[in-house]
Swiss-Prot record:
One GO CC term, this protein: endoplasmic reticulum lumen
Protein name: Protein O-glucosyltransferase 3
Native organism taxonomy: Eukaryota, Metazoa, Chordata, Craniata, Vertebrata
Source organism per UniProt: Mus musculus (Mouse)
Main location: endoplasmic reticulum
Protein family membership: Belongs to the KDELC family.
C-alpha cells in the first residue's frame, strides 16, 4: 500500500501560497483504494493538492473547483453498484476519497480523478479484475502476500507485550478453568474454534449478545485471508478478566478482550466499536475512522477556546467535570447526556442535550475521561484536530502504547485536579498546543487506518495459534457461524476451483 513519507505528512516544508491554484497533473493520489487486491469494507485513497510550482497546499485550496471522482466497472457489460460520496476535505491540503462496492467487479475498475476538467496525477487508474467487494468469500491462501498487500507493520508493540505472559498456551487448562472461572450466569465469554477457515462458537454465561460484533469481524477477516487453526475465548464484557500474575500457580489464562489494564493479563484486540464502525461505514453508521477525518469542524484559529465534554454518567469523574464547568464556564463546557449510574445527581447537575459528535470539534480542547473502562470515543477524538486532554488511566486499548503524553496529547490527573491548569496552559501556549494536536492527529491517522485493524487482528490470531500446545477442536455445543449466503455475497472467486474440477 503506497503511502507518502512521514516527513511529508508531518511538515510540508514547501507550502503553496495563499493565491496559488491547484495543478491537477502535479497533485498526488495514493492509498489502498487504488489497489485491486486490498479488499476492505470501504475502499479509500488520498489526494494531496499541489500548485503549479510543485508546492503542497497545507490548508483547503482556495476557489470553488472541487476534486471529483468517478469509479465504474472496467467493462460496460458488467453492472456494479458502487457508492462514491464527495471527497472529504481534511483541511490540511489533503482529501480522503471513499467508495463502497456492493458487488464484485470481475473485469476490474476504472477510477477517474478530476480537478475541474483535468485528470489528477496518473488518472485514470485501472484496477485489473477481479476487484472483490466486502462480502465476497475469497480468502488469500498466502498470509504473507495478504499482509504485504495491506502493508502490515512488521510488529505491533502491544501484541508483543501481551504474549510475553504466554510462551505456550495450554488448551486443556483453559477448557477446565474458563467455564468455572468466567462462564457463570453473569459471564460474557464466547468460546471460538477456527478450523479450515470456518468459525465455530459456543456461548458461556448470560450476557453474550455482543458476540454479533466478534462474529462479524472474524467472518470479514476469514473472507480476506486464510486464518490459522486455533481455539480461544473472547471476553465480551467491559472489564479485562485475567488478573493472575505470570509467576502464580496456576498461571494466567490468555483471555482475549477489547480493553486491557495495568493489573490484568488479557490479550487485547481492537474494540468492537472501531471494528463495527469500519464494517458498517457508509452504510449503517455515520461516525467511523474515515468519516471523522473530514468533519473536524472549524480551523484551529476559529475554534472555541474552551475544553469540551459530553457523555454518559459512567464514571464519577464525569460528574466532577460538570461541577467544574458550572464553576468555570469560561474554561470548560461539560455536560452529562444520560444518567444510569448516578440517577440521583440529575436534578443537581442537569441533563445536557445530545449533540452530533462532529460538533465536538467546534471546541479547541477535548476532555477524554474514562467510562466504565477506557472511553471508546478516544480514537475518534484523536482523529480530529482539537487538542486532547486525556485522563491518566489504568485502562488501555490496542493502540495506546504508541501515544506519548505531551507529544500526542496532554495528560490530566486521574482526579482531574489539574484540568483547569492544563486548559489555561493550552490557552497561553497556543502554538505548542496546536503542534501537539497535529502530531496526535497524524499518528492516529496512521495507527487507526482500517487495514491496520485487520493486520492487528490477524497478527493476534497468528501469534496465538503458534503457541497452542495441542490441536484445536470443534467442541460439544459449538455451532458454525456461517458466511452470508444471500444476494450480497454473490461473486466468482478466482482462487476456488470450479465445482466440476473438484468432482
Amino acid at each position: 500500500m503506497q503511502a507518502l513519507p512521514l516527513g511529508l505528512q508531518l511538515a510540508l516544508l514547501v507550502a503553496a501560497g495563499a493565491g496559488a491554484r491547484v495543478s491537477a497533473p502535479r497533485s498526488l493520489a495514493w492509498g489502498p483504494g487504488l489497489q485491486a487486491a486490498a479488499v476492505l469494507p470501504v475502499r479509500y485513497f488520498f489526494l494531496q493538492s499541489v500548485d503549479s510550482d510543485g508546492r503542497n497546499f497545507t490548508s483547503s485550496p482556495p476557489g470553488q473547483t472541487q476534486f471529483k471522482v468517478v469509479v465504474k466497472s472496467l467493462s460496460p457489460k458488467e453492472l456494479v453498484r458502487i457508492y462514491v460520496p464527495k471527497p472529504l476535505d481534511r483541511n490540511d491540503g489533503t482529501f480522503l476519497v471513499r467508495y463502497r462496492m456492493h458487488e464484485t467487479a470481475h473485469k476490474g475498475l476504472k477510477i477517474e480523478i478530476l480537478h475541474g476538467s483535468e485528470h489528477v496525477a496518473h488518472s485514470p487508474y485501472i484496477l485489473k479484475g477481479p476487484v472483490y467487494h466486502e462480502y465476497c468469500d475469497c480468502p488469500e491462501d498466502d498470509p504473507q502476500v495478504w499482509q504485504e498487500t495491506l502493508s502490515c507493520p512488521a510488529s505491533e508493540p502491544q501484541i508483543e507485550q501481551d504474549f510475553v505472559s504466554f510462551p505456550s498456551i495450554n488448551l486443556q487448562q483453559m477448557l477446565k478453568e474458563v467455564p468455572t472461572r468466567f462462564g457463570d450466569e453473569r459471564g460474557a465469554v464466547v468460546h471460538y474454534t477456527i478450523l479450515n477457515n470456518h468459525i465455530y462458537r459456543r456461548s458461556l454465561g448470560k450476557y453474550t449478545d455482543f458476540k454479533m460484533f466478534s462474529d462479524e469481524i472474524l467472518l470479514s477477516l476469514a473472507r480476506k485471508v486464510t486464518l490459522p487453526d486455533l481455539e480461544f475465548y473472547i471476553n465480551l464484557g467491559d472489564w479485562p478478566l485475567e488478573h493472575r500474575k505470570v509467576n502464580d500457580t496456576p498461571g494466567p489464562i490468555p483471555i482475549i478482550s477489547w480493553c486491557g489494564s495495568l493489573d490484568s493479563r488479557d490479550i487485547i484486540l481492537p474494540t468492537y466499536d472501531v471494528t463495527h464502525s469500519t464494517l458498517e461505514a457508509m452504510r449503517g453508521v455515520t461516525n467511523d475512522l474515515l468519516s471523522v477525518q473530514g468533519n473536524t469542524g472549524p480551523s484551529w484559529i476559529n475554534k472555541t477556546e474552551k475544553a469540551f465534554f459530553r457523555g454518559r454518567d459512567s464514571r464519577e469523574e464525569r460528574l466532577q467535570l460538570v461541577l467544574l464547568s458550572k464553576e468555570n464556564p469560561q474554561l470548560l463546557d461539560a455536560g452529562i447526556t444520560g444518567y444510569f449510574f448516578f440517577q440521583e445527581k440529575e436534578k443537581e447537575l442537569g441533563k445536557a442535550k445530545l449533540m452530533g459528535f462532529f460538533d465536538f470539534f467546534k471546541y479547541k480542547y477535548q476532555v477524554n475521561v474514562d467510562g466504565t473502562v477506557a472511553a471508546y470515543r478516544y480514537p475518534y477524538l484523536m482523529l480530529g484536530d482539537s487538542l486532547v486532554l486525556k485522563q491518566e488511566s489504568p485502562y488501555y486499548e490496542h493502540f495506546y502504547v504508541a501515544l506519548k503524553p505531551w507529544k500526542h496529547y496532554v495528560p490530566i490527573k486521574r482526579n482531574l485536579g489539574d484540568l483547569l491548569e492544563k486548559v489555561k496552559w493550552a490557552k497561553e501556549n497556543d502554538e505548542e498546543a496546536k503542534k501537539i494536536a497535529k502530531e496526535g492527529q497524524l499518528t492516529a491517522r496512521d495507527l487507526l487506518q482500517p487495514p491496520r485493524l485487520y493486520c492487528y487482528y490477524y497478527r493476534v490470531l497468528q501469534k496465538y495459534a503458534e503457541r497452542q500446545a495441542s490441536k484445536p477442536m470443534i467442541r460439544d455445543g459449538m455451532e458454525l457461524v456461517p458466511q452470508p449466503d444471500d444476494g450480497t455475497s454473490i461473486c466468482q472467486c478466482h482462487r476456488r476451483r470450479p465445482e466440476r474440477e473438484e468432482l
